[in-house]
Regions:
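Perimembrane helix-loop-helix junctions
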Residues: 219-226, 259-287
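Transmembrane alpha-helix segments characteristic
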Residues: 57, 363, 374-387
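Start-transfer (signal-anchor) and selected internal transmembrane alpha helices
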Residues: 27-66
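Transmembrane helix irregularities
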Residues: 171, 248-257, 288-292
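Short hydrophobic alpha-helices at membrane interfaces in multi-pass membrane enzymes
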Residues: 206-248, 277
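Active-site lumenal/periplasmic loops and adjacent helix-entry segments of GT-C-fold
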Residues: 65-194, 199, 208-217, 223-229
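Periplasmic/ER-lumenal interhelical loops and adjacent helix-loop junctions
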Residues: 36-37, 80, 87, 91-101, ...
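Transmembrane alpha-helical segments
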Residues: 144-151, 192-208, 245-246, 263-270, ...
Length: 387
């Protein structure tokens, strides 16, 4: 017979469970020396991020500084594919959900899915749609640098590598070309995709972290090993949900990304083994949010509805010429100079013309070198497949 009540037994088990959890925390808790070193690394990391942001913001002020007065007086950022965007949050949300396209005499058809993220952006800035578009164009460069910095941090803790990744992503020729031509959809995709990758990596438990290697033996480890060797990070369903919502934003801006995401995430789910369900969850919002649009694409496929997959928001832009194979390999959209410096004189013009090609070649060489590394070779090959 039991010598205690069921309540006493439950309390005893609870105390034992809490004691085991406390012992586990004490076993892996960093020492005072480790905490000091981690704080130093955090200061270095913050200084690196501040330097990157300072450089990018200074460049942003140089490029868009003359616009500030015009925009403050009610001006608009227009040109290329970017059209005037009048309307309030209610107008944008009504157009996104009404199922009625107002162009011409009007017709019953699903709205452009890009209106959904635009409605969220309009609500975020607290003004009209034109204010949201102006703000997005003006802060696109710092946002791209932030995206590159934090996404690189999921794979490495090196401040130098993260700084280079942030600057390369912010100075990408394709991104600058989309800004110059007013392709708002391509701009949003460039800003969102790194966060999709970061959230997807967190979803499967891949995230680099600072680990301090001290000469002393870590307490509580019978074999004298390091805590890093025995620690296994779990995936996060919340991160998978965030990746799905961010991917939905990217797909709304460029619908052609949905088949690309399927081609990338399905093999990744097969390789992930334990986290395959988590990766498949990432695809759900991208399918559900623009669902009426997919119905229109499938229903009119034989009549040319497939063109809706490659459609871009905004006015059509006529390109001067198609890029060559070498330009595509280097990530150049054809005849792209850094920040429009191709007409400048002297070293500045040379830098503007040669810089994009040199940057693309450097990224290509680093990516090729990563293929021969033994560590994380599966992830590198998967990234090449996705690219």
């Amino acid at each position: 017979p039991l010598l205690g009540t069921w309540r006493q037994v439950a309390a005893e088990r609870r105390d034992a469970r809490l004691a085991r959890a406390e012992a586990q925390r004490n076993r892996w808790a960093p020492s005072e020396l480790e905490r000091t070193e981690l704080r130093r690394l955090a200061r270095v990391r913050r200084a690196g991020l501040a330097a990157v942001l300072l450089a990018v913001v200074a460049l942003d002020v140089v490029l868009f500084g003359p616009w500030q007065g015009v925009l403050a007086d009610g001006g608009r950022v227009v040109g290329g594919a970017l059209l005037p965007a009048p309307g309030t949050l209610g107008d944008v949300w009504g157009s996104a959900t009404s199922g009625w396209v107002r162009d011409g005499l009007g017709t019953s058809a699903p709205a452009d899915p890009f209106l959904v993220p635009l409605a969220g952006l309009t609500a975020l800035v607290g003004g009209g749609l034109q204010t949201a578009v102006n703000a997005l164009v003006l802060v696109a460069l710092p946002l791209a640098a932030l995206a590159g910095w934090f996404t690189a941090g999921a794979l490495t803790r090196s401040v130098g590598v993260r700084a280079v990744a942030a600057l390369v992503w912010a100075a990408s020729p394709g991104f600058l070309a989309s800004l110059a031509s007013g392709r708002l959809g391509a701009t949003v995709v460039h800003l969102v995709l790194p966060w999709v990758l970061l959230a997807a990596l967190r979803a499967v438990g891949v995230h680099a972290r600072d680990v301090v290697d001290l000469p002393e033996v870590h307490r509580g480890l019978p074999d004298g090993g390091r805590a890093r060797a025995a620690t296994r990070r779990r995936g996060s369903l919340g991160a998978a949900g965030a990746a799905g919502l961010l991917l939905a934003v990217a797909v709304c801006a460029a619908p052609v990304l949905l088949p690309v995401a399927v081609v990338v995430l399905v093999p990744a789910a097969l390789l992930a083994r334990r986290a395959w369900r988590t990766l498949l969850v990432v695809l759900v919002p991208a399918v559900v949010v623009p669902l009426p649009y997919w119905g229109q694409v499938v229903g009119s496929w034989a009549d040319g509805g497939w063109r809706l997959l490659v459609a871009e928001p905004g006015a059509p832009v006529v390109e001067q010429g198609a890029p060559s194979g070498l330009e595509l390999l280097l990530g150049l959209p054809g005849g792209t100079a850094w920040f429009g410096l191709d007409d400048a004189d002297g070293a500045l013009g040379t830098l503007g013309r040669v810089g994009p090609a040199v940057g693309g070649a450097l990224v290509l060489l680093l990516a090729a070198a990563a293929l021969v590394r033994r560590r994380a070779v599966r992830g590198v090959r998967l990234a090449w497949f996705g690219a």
